Amino acid sequence: MRIKNKIKKRIIELIELAYITARKGDLELAREYIKLAEMYSRKGRVKIPLKYKRMFCRKCYTPLITGVTERRRIRSKILIRTCLICNWQRRYVLSRNKGSNKEN
């Protein structure tokens, strides 16, 4: 179990490093970091946490930075995220907060 925790920690470090590198402008190096993180995930059979999985394009492995490599649109309670490099789209249903309708 200890090895899987080390692998997961390294995956998170690589994805965060890729995000920082992409912000500085080196998209190719950022893609390599994410590909390496994906490889670690597959070889070690460790799931990438959802927060980090949504930080990159699953088709071209580019870190998704709003306004730089990603476009976000909201249409009728659906968030559409589009990668500006490969035009890959992902849709997420926007839901209300679970406690927002409760009367106090």
From Swiss-Prot:
Keywords: Cytoplasm, Endonuclease, Hydrolase, Metal-binding, Nuclease, tRNA processing, Zinc. The keyword Nuclease applies. One of its GO terms (molecular function) is ribonuclease P activity. It holds the Pfam family Rpr2. It catalyses: Endonucleolytic cleavage of RNA, removing 5'-extranucleotides from tRNA precursor. Gene3D superfamilies: 6.20.50.20, Immunoglobulin FC, subunit C. Binds 1 zinc ion per subunit. It is found in: Cytoplasm. Its EC number is 3.1.26.5. Its cofactor is Zn(2+). GO terms for biological process: tRNA 5'-leader removal. It is an enzyme of class 3 (hydrolase). GO terms for cellular component: cytoplasm; ribonuclease P complex. Its main location: cytoplasm. Zn(2+) binds at residues 57, 60, 83, 86. The keyword Flavoprotein does not apply. Belongs to the eukaryotic/archaeal RNase P protein component 4 family. Part of ribonuclease P, a protein complex that generates mature tRNA molecules by cleaving their 5'-ends. Consists of a catalytic RNA component and at least 4-5 protein subunits. This is Ribonuclease P protein component 4.
